């Protein structure tokens, strides 16, 4: 490897893409194309970066498997950052295997981190845990350790393990400072803000108050029956009844939970669950059917009883019932929560992350755009959607993916 290529690679490793480009901008050999692609990615020009990396992968000879694998990893990272979640996973898996087999532990670990970050983004937490298992980051350079601990922190946050998340973020910050890359330090600091953001609202006895993530963790461990409107579930300590695919049942459970220890009139439940302005006999019959289904689903945790004017919810083992609501109740809040990260998402990537159909997501995007809450740019397959981050807006911390759609 010649001196200019070495110097450009060192500049990229130090977070200096302009310094790298000064050395290789006019060269078209395979190593230079790869370095130019990575530099353009660091500068945010993802379209040009992908084109350069594809050219580099083609330019490397058949005996340069490691170099081609590194190009694949770089392409995968660009796809992740640009929210192209449809990028082929198998290509990254194959590249990771090649790098591992040839002793390139640093880039193999980076490939695994990308795999985990994608799984984390689309809510497949168990698979993300499995990918991380057995990876020892201690021998990795500081920048790679930072990336690893950011992933560990992200998993811990999604699992409401705030102590583990703080410890991972502290390790990530120390490693980022050791690496001396300002952008990496800023990324860690941004991730740490999640622990200080409002994660939900506690609704009980006619009042509500905001909760931080560690307070949500304490709530889930307490002797309280929680109607979880963030994950569409009913939980008491370690027992969880998911209603994520039963939106009508969850709507009824939430209404009964908010009214506890009182009851909810039948006509009010019809209006809430079925959006009917006037309850006729067919509505009441449907309500009886849905209440019967809810009663069966909640048998381990609570009892749904009939009262003179409606229905009430009574916990079986818990002391009280509360509702954990998102920071802001917003139509299509799951879509807005993902867009709140400030990145530009395609509708197909949103559908993958939410486990919803493309048609459902497209309809939600059109309604949000009509309301002026998001903006779209580009045409056809290149169309992307984004929104400014709104203070107090529901984060994706509590989103399990998939959630029920209309």
PLM feature segments, named:
Residues 2, 31, 38, 70, ...:
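Residue register of alpha-helical TPR repeats
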Residues 6, 35, 67, 74, ...:
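"A position-specific structural signal for the A-helix of alpha-solenoid helical repeats
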Residues 21, 28, 54-60, 93-104, ...:
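Amphipathic alpha-helical segments of tetratricopeptide repeats
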Residues 280-323, 366-383:
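DNA-binding patch around the recognition helix
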């Amino acid at each position: 490897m010649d001196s200019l290529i070495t110097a450009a690679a060192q500049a990229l490793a130090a977070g200096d893409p302009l310094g790298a480009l000064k050395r290789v901008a006019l060269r078209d050999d395979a190593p230079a194309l790869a370095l130019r692609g990575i530099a353009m990615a660091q500068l945010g020009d993802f379209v040009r970066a992908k084109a350069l990396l594809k050219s580099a992968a083609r330019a490397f000879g058949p005996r340069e498997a490691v170099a081609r694998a590194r190009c694949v990893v770089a392409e995968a990272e660009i796809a992740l950052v640009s929210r192209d979640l449809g990028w082929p996973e198998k290509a990254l898996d194959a590249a990771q295997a090649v790098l591992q087999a040839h002793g390139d532990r640093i880039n193999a670990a980076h490939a695994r981190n990308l795999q985990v970050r994608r799984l984390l983004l689309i809510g497949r937490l168990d698979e993300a845990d499995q990918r991380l298992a057995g990876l020892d980051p201690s021998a990795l350079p500081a920048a790679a350790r930072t990336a690893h601990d950011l992933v560990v922190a992200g998993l811990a946050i999604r699992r409401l393990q705030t102590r583990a998340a703080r410890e991972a973020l502290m390790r990530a910050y120390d490693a980022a400072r050791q690496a001396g890359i300002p952008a990496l330090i800023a990324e860690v600091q941004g991730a740490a803000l999640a622990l200080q953001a409002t994660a939900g609202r506690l609704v009980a006895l006619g009042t509500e108050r905001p909760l931080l993530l560690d307070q949500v963790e304490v709530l889930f461990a307490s002797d309280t029956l929680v109607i979880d409107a963030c994950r569409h579930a009913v939980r008491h300590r370690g027992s969880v009844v998911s209603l994520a695919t039963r939106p009508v049942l969850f709507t009824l459970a939430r209404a009964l939970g908010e009214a506890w220890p009182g009851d909810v009139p039948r006509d009010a439940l019809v209006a809430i669950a079925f959006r009917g302005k006037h309850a006729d006999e067919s509505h009441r019959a449907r309500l009886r059917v849905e209440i019967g289904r809810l009663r069966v689903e909640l048998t381990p945790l609570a009892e749904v009883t009939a009262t003179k004017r409606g229905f009430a919810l009574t916990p079986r083992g818990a002391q009280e019932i509360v509702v954990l609501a998102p920071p802001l109740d917003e139509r299509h809040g799951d879509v807005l929560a993902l867009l709140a990260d400030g990145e530009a998402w395609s509708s197909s990537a949103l559908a993958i992350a939410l486990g919803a159909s493309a048609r459902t997501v497209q309809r939600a995007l059109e309604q949000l755009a009509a309301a002026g809450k998001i903006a779209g740019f580009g045409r056809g397959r290149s169309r992307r959607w984004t929104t400014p981050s709104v203070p107090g807006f529901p984060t994706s911390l509590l989103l399990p993916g998939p959630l029920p759609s209309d």
